[in-house]
């Protein structure tokens, strides 16, 4: 969602604030702004649109000051125009905010009755006026923050600077993440480690309910009970700095091409590739005591768990429930002690998924999280973490994090099967060898990049696309449809191939192509029958299959993307790549913003 940066420095901070905001662009935004304190006075510049517009304004109106805050806004309350951009200011303070204040209408009404006027449609302005009211009553800055905080319902992370105070910044967290960076006589606050990595190499993460007072003399963090607390200081790993596109046109293109390498790192963590065995997770989880797995996730991460369901059921004979996190958290389902709850999230900050994790913990259920950000809130709160090791992912549409989630889940399923006695030593060697081949095969698929771009030229003028898949290819079809609509803004829907005749076939005509994900596996013949139904109605088919599948298909109405022949087990990981390339090239041909699609955020930290 929104991105926050705050700097209490030794020199003019405006350019550094912009640099920090650029590192937060991947989160998605529609406006931006910065505010500084110079000689006790507050100054602010904001702009609608991309950061380049803010930079142009700053050239005309430079901001001085060694204390400042910055923000990239993703609209929730109020349209994406400059007046709604952060920071918001009053005569006493400037504030940036990530989150949603659920009772802002009630608070706004109260403040209006007291004579306060509102210039924006945002919920953030309510916080600004609440703190200002408290300051006018004679409270200190710290007391004003604490008093106002008690009135707020919802999720928020805020950073505040004050008129007349060149050496004070206060940050508070109730939900969305905040990190503090420690420099030499200067300090930083940011939404995540990526924002701070170019300034410092030591950070601490604020816990839920924390608030912090920053001066050039040091940082004091207070817990929810308002008592000083010590939070562990983490040294940033080198990969946090790797946010350059290199020779690639877009971050997404770079991240797709990084998949062979990052999956190699992932597999080395979970597999003994010298002996072709799974590294045991027994010190974390005793699979013999587990009778059911509960997955709760959102978006692309949810689709990874749909694939995993097949693996855990087939290999480990475990019952699996898959839930969309935003639905699960409001159902209050009964959960027993023999359940392992698993939460998948690239950022580890997804609000709905985090709420599900907390629900399961409160009910005494063992919790595991599969995340890409190992210092995230979910990683800290779960009983144990399975890192995906994908490295920083900047493109809003997930690519390498998704395939690393699949690889992690595949290794996890093999370990469960091995512990439960349903996986022979021979089968273990066989499946681990198959996983070890994934990086090499992905490199082969990447050689089809140019061919896939040519096929995508036929998609730029369509009015919609259907994706079909069966078995483990069904979740990949769902992910393909999601990727295409995220990036190209073409309406796309994914369906289980067997559901075609139960409604979607009514949409089939020459203007709506059907993309079929169908390796030559045990489901291929049935999927081929569905393809023939499409062809009989003059539908246009794009078939993603392997050499054997292409030989069998032989339909005149299709374009074919032919992948190497591969085992059924690893097919979902391999077939994820061509559906990513289809979405990417279609979006590029249409001229959309591939790395930052409209209305989307990388880290969804509010409901």
Swiss-Prot record:
Biological process terms in GO annotation: carbohydrate metabolic process; fructose 6-phosphate metabolic process; protein N-linked glycosylation; UDP-N-acetylglucosamine metabolic process
Positions of the catalytic residues: 2 (nucleophile), 602 (for fru-6p isomerization activity)
All copies of domain Glutamine amidotransferase type-2, residue ranges: 2-217
InterPro entries: GATase_2_dom (IPR017932), GFAT (IPR005855), GFAT_N (IPR047084), GlmS/AgaS_SIS (IPR035466), GlmS/FrlB_SIS (IPR035490), Ntn_hydrolases_N (IPR029055), SIS_dom (IPR001347), SIS_dom_sf (IPR046348)
Compartments, as annotated in UniProt: Cytoplasm
SUPFAM superfamilies documented for this protein: N-terminal nucleophile aminohydrolases (Ntn hydrolases), SIS domain
Predominant cellular place of this UniProt entry's protein: cytoplasm
Signal sequence interval, chain numbering: none
Keywords, alphabetical: Aminotransferase, Cytoplasm, Glutamine amidotransferase, Repeat, Transferase
SS bond list: none
GO MF annotations, alphabetized: carbohydrate derivative binding; glutamine-fructose-6-phosphate transaminase (isomerizing) activity
Main enzyme class: transferase
GO cellular component terms given for this protein: cytosol
Reactions performed catalytically: D-fructose 6-phosphate + L-glutamine = D-glucosamine 6-phosphate + L-glutamate
Subunit structure: Homodimer.
Stored NCBIfam families: glmS, PRK00331.1
Record function comment: Catalyzes the first step in hexosamine metabolism, converting fructose-6P into glucosamine-6P using glutamine as a nitrogen source.
Name assigned to this protein: Glutamine--fructose-6-phosphate aminotransferase [isomerizing]
Phylogenetic classification of the source organism: Bacteria, Pseudomonadati, Pseudomonadota, Alphaproteobacteria, Hyphomicrobiales
Gene: glmS
């Amino acid at each position: 969602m929104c991105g926050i940066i705050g700097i209490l420095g030794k020199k003019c901070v405006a350019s550094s604030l912009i640099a920090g905001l650029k590192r937060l662009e991947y989160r998605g935004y529609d406006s931006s702004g910065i505010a500084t304190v110079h000689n006790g006075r507050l100054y602010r510049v904001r702009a609608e649109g991309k950061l380049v517009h803010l930079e142009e304004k700053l050239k005309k109106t430079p901001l001085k000051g060694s204390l400042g805050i910055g923000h990239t806004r993703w609209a929730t309350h109020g349209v994406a125009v400059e007046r709604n951009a952060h920071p918001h200011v009053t005569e006493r303070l400037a504030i940036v905010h990530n989150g949603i204040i659920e009772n802002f209408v009630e608070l706004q009404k109260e403040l209006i009755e007291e004579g306060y006027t509102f210039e924006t449609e945002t919920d953030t302005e309510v916080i600004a006026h609440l703190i200002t009211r408290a300051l006018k009553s004679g409270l200190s800055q710290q007391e004003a923050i604490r008093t106002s905080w008690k009135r707020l319902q919802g999720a928020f992370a805020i950073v505040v600077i004050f008129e007349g105070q060149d050496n004070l910044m206060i940050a508070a967290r109730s939900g969305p993440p905040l990190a503090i960076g420690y420099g030499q006589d200067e300090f930083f606050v940011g939404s995540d480690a990526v924002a701070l990595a170019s300034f410092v190499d030591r950070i601490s993460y604020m816990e839920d309910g924390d608030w912090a007072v920053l001066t050039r003399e040091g940082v004091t963090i207070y817990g929810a009970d308002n008592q000083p607390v010590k939070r562990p200081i983490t040294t940033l790993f080198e990969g946090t700095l790797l946010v350059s596109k290199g020779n690639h046109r877009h971050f997404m293109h770079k991240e797709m091409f990084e998949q062979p390498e990052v999956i190699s790192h992932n597999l080395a963590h979970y597999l003994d590739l010298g002996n072709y065995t799974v590294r045991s997770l027994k010190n974390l989880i005793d699979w013999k005591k587990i009778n059911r797995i509960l997955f709760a996730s959102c978006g692309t991460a949810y689709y990874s768990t749909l694939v995993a369901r097949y693996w855990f059921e087939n290999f480990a004979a475990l019952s699996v429930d898959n839930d969309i996190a935003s639905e699960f958290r409001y159902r209050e389902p009964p959960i027993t002690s023999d359940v392992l709850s698993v939460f998948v999230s690239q950022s580890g900050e997804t609000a709905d998924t985090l709420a599900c994790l907390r629900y399961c913990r409160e009910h005494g259920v063992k919790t595991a999280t599969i995340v890409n950000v190992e210092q995230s809130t979910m990683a800290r709160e779960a009983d144990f973490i399975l890192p995906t090791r994908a490295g920083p992912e900047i493109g809003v549409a997930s690519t390498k994090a998704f395939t690393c989630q699949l690889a992690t889940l595949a290794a996890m399923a093999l370990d469960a099967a091995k512990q439960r006695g349903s996986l022979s030593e021979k089968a273990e060697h066989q499946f681990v060898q198959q996983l070890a081949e994934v990086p090499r095969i992905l490199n082969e698929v990447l050689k089809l990049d140019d061919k896939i771009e040519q096929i995508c030229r036929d998609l730029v003028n369509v009015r919609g696309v259907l994706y079909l898949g069966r078995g483990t290819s069904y979740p990949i079809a769902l992910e393909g449809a999601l990727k295409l609509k995220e990036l190209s803004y073409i309406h796309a829907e994914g369906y289980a191939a067997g559901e075609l005749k139960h409604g979607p076939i009514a949409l089939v005509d020459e203007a709506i192509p059907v993309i079929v994900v169908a390796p030559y596996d045990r489901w291929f013949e049935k999927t081929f029958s569905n393809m023939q139904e499409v062809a009989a109605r003059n539908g246009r088919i794009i078939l993603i299959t392997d050499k054997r599948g292409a030989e069998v298909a032989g339909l005149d109405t299709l374009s074919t993307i032919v992948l190497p022949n591969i085992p059924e087990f690893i097919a979902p990981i391999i077939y994820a790549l061509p559906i990513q390339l289809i979405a990417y090239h279609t979006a590029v041909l249409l001229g959309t913003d591939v790395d930052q699609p409209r209305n989307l955020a990388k880290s969804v930290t509010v409901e």
